[in-house]
């Protein structure tokens, strides 16, 4: 098969779109060679996820959230709400190894993501930090899978703690309660010797505290060069097209500044080379600047955005990818990876249609879209004995040592590994391989 084609099981011959190398825009002083002729991402294998004894979504994985690769240990972690566990995959081989439960147990899927868990995961060996319903944050010692610390950020009853980021130098977590109104972040100190968590100051994301977040708060990221956290805010103020990225000073527990980002709905956030921030947009607007109507006549204008972390200047608008959730920068191949679970190219209507939806590969050096590759969405089943929630491909992470890319897929009978041995009937993590001729990007 041509390297430009990808067979995802029953999606035989489904076209992967390598978009080539366009003339360079601002390369931020980077002068390394252009990409090799073959940059296509290909499906390597599937890591099937077994149903746990506590699974409550028809015996398969449909509800899951953020994933993370610990680069030092080459271990992939996935917050799996269907199985009330963290799924673990060997990021060197792409094989499933185990599921980690918390004690007391994670909430699991409740019928509402805002009250479910686990949700966010970040690892710094030997500690795994995981968020849960009821504003819960735990530390798990991955040497023995024991829960060694358990705290609450103090949000409204039942609502979850969601995404989080970690400053390993100072031992500080920023944990986001996105479902509270207004949303807020909590600084939590980590005892790097014992894993013990100590809840610190709260940062409220409302107008009185510098940012009028009216539709939640999404992915935080730590920037060691500026010693600041950054956080994507989908909507600031009453206008749906106005979002932004805020810069947070963890030492004063304040929002220092807001970098406006329009026509995007910022969700995913990743720190790339040259102090760039890659923003995964979670809303599709049209070319007239309105929220895209799939039944209308105005074309969709899907995009992700790259800004300068120090100035907030928009360095590039990457058209043709999005909308999605989590994004990732892989220093091993110099690419950003962007989910596209809400892409205008996905099967519609979303509530009843299942099928492939494109994720994106973006060259961090050239700041151009290189490729779209298929992932998979599954709609909810709301009647009968097999009821389950919808599942969308909104989570992504990569291993910089071997450039394997990991995308969890909800349970389906359409996806099969290239060797025909692994399927996704109970949910899986799709493992993609990508050989890139570029050297690492600093």
State what each model feature region is:
Residues 9-18:
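Bacterial N-terminal signal peptides
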Residues 18-442:
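Predominantly soluble domains enriched in secretory-pathway, periplasmic, or organellar proteins
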Residues 1-9:
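Bacterial N-terminal signal peptides that target proteins for export
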């Amino acid at each position: 098969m041509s390297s430009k084609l990808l067979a995802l099981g029953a999606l035989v011959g489904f076209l992967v779109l390598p978009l080539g190398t366009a003339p360079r825009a601002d390369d931020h002083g980077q002068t390394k060679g252009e990409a090799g002729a073959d940059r296509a991402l290909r499906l390597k294998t599937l890591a099937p996820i077994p149903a746990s004894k506590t699974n409550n979504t028809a015996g398969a994985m449909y509800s899951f959230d953020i994933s993370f690769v610990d680069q030092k240990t080459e271990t992939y972690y996935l917050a799996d709400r269907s199985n009330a566990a963290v799924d673990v995959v060997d990021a060197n081989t792409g094989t499933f190894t185990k599921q980690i439960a918390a004690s007391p147990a994670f909430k699991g899927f409740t019928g509402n993501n805002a009250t479910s868990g686990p949700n966010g995961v970040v690892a710094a060996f030997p500690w795994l930090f995981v968020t849960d319903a009821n504003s819960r944050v735990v530390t798990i010692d991955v040497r023995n899978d024991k829960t060694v610390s358990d705290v609450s950020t103090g949000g409204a009853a039942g609502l979850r703690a969601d995404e989080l980021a970690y400053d390993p130098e100072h031992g500080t977590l920023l944990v986001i309660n996105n479902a509270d109104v207004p949303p807020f972040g909590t600084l939590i100190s980590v005892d790097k010797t014992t894993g013990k968590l100590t809840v610190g100051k709260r940062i409220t994301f409302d107008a009185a505290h510098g940012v009028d977040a009216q539709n939640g708060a999404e992915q935080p990221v730590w920037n060691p060069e500026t010693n600041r956290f950054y956080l994507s805010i989908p909507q600031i103020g009453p206008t749906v097209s106005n979002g932004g990225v805020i810069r947070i000073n963890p030492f004063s527990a304040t929002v220092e500044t807001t970098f406006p980002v329009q026509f995007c709905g910022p969700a995913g956030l990743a720190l790339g080379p040259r102090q760039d921030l890659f923003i995964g947009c979670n809303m599709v607007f049209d070319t007239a600047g309105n929220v895209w109507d799939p039944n209308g006549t105005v074309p969709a204008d899907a995009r992700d955005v790259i800004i300068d972390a120090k100035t907030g200047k928009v360095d590039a608008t990457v058209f043709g990818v999005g909308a999605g959730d989590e994004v990732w920068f892989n220093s091993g191949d110099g690419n950003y990876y962007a989910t596209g679970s809400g892409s205008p190219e996905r099967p519609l209507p979303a509530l009843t249609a299942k099928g492939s939806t494109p994720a994106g590969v973006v060259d961090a050096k050239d700041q151009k879209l290189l490729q779209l590759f298929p992932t998979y969405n599954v709609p909810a089943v709301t009647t009968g004995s097999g009821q389950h929630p919808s599942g969308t491909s909104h989570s992504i992470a990569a291993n910089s040592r071997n450039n394997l890319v990991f995308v969890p897929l909800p349970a389906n009978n359409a996806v099969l590994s290239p060797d025909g041995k692994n399927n996704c009937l109970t949910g899986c993590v799709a493992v993609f391989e990508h050989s890139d001729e570029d050297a690492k990007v600093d």
